[in-house]
């Protein structure tokens, strides 16, 4: 019983951390990284398709991404999709290759991005605490139904707290890494 509750809580907490990671990927640093374009969708024969499924995305240098479409007729569509995305990027086409220079971040922009990252991290911590509350509630229900003893409940809550601390620490590590990335010039 307790192990099932712990396993469920741990699964949900790892998903919360993954969600924070994916939110962090959308926050642009000064460095070029293919995951910046993960949210870009291209009109591919009438359906919105992720850019990574219609083109190769490569890092040409520290501040430039290269996009090579698999079909030449997609070049204008990809350009349009990148311009439409709210990433603040301006693609430059050179034949079949689309180069995307990463604009340098101003100090103010860096601080705003870091604020956004802190908010995402806080949302992740809140989600983890809510999962802890749910798990502890499930343990209390088992005590009420006399399926586990008070001592088992206490041990279970301690285990839930350890798991919670582990995942909150993971979010903190990722936030620190993101801050380092953002504040690096």
Swiss-Prot record:
It is found in: Cytoplasm. GO terms for cellular component: cytosol. SUPFAM superfamilies: Ribosome recycling factor, RRF. Keywords: Cytoplasm, Protein biosynthesis. Pfam families: RRF (PF01765). Its main location: cytoplasm. GO terms for molecular function: ribosomal large subunit binding. GO terms for biological process: cytoplasmic translational termination. InterPro entries: Ribosome_recyc_fac, Ribosome_recyc_fac_dom, RRF_sf. NCBIfam families: frr. Belongs to the RRF family. Responsible for the release of ribosomes from messenger RNA at the termination of protein biosynthesis. May increase the efficiency of translation by recycling ribosomes from one round of translation to another. HAMAP family: RRF. This is Ribosome-recycling factor. The lineage of its organism: Bacteria, Pseudomonadati, Pseudomonadota, Gammaproteobacteria, Oceanospirillales.
């Amino acid at each position: 019983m307790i192990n099932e509750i712990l396993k469920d809580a741990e699964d949900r907490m790892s998903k919360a951390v993954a969600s924070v990671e994916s939110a962090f990927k959308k926050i642009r640093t000064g460095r070029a990284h293919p995951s910046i374009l993960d949210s870009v969708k291209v009109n591919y024969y009438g359906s919105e398709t992720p850019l990574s499924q219609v083109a190769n995305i490569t890092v040409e240098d520290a501040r430039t991404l290269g996009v090579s479409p698999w079909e030449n007729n997609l070049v204008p569509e990809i350009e349009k999709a990148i311009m439409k995305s709210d990433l603040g990027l301006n693609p430059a086409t050179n034949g079949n290759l689309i180069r995307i220079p990463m604009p340098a971040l101003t100090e103010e922009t860096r601080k705003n991005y870091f604020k956004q990252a802190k908010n995402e991290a806080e949302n992740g911590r809140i989600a983890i605490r809510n999962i802890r509350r749910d798990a502890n509630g499930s343990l209390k229900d088992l005590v009420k139904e006399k399926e586990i003893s008070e001592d088992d409940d206490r041990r279970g809550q301690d285990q839930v707290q350890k798991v919670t601390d582990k995942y909150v620490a993971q979010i903190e590590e990722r936030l620190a890494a993101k801050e380092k990335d953002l504040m690096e010039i």
